[in-house]
């Protein structure tokens, strides 16, 4: 990785030219950590199902788990109702403080 900002997403600087693609069922916490150690400049979570967040299903917490060195961290939501996506984001943003959604 480099200390130079290659590009920005909003206010988030991406300092490197490798980005871990979001892959549901693959990009769990250990895999994101390994990719970060190998030079990934941005980590993306697995899909976070909005209904899991709204019903407090434990499955989403496993998919959301991360270490501070995984930052910048992007959340990706799975949902088909704008209101549910917004409600899930309002629950997770204070807790996770994602860099990108």
Predicted regions and their residues:
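Glycine-rich, positively charged N-terminal anion/phosphate-binding segment
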Residues: 2-8, 23-100
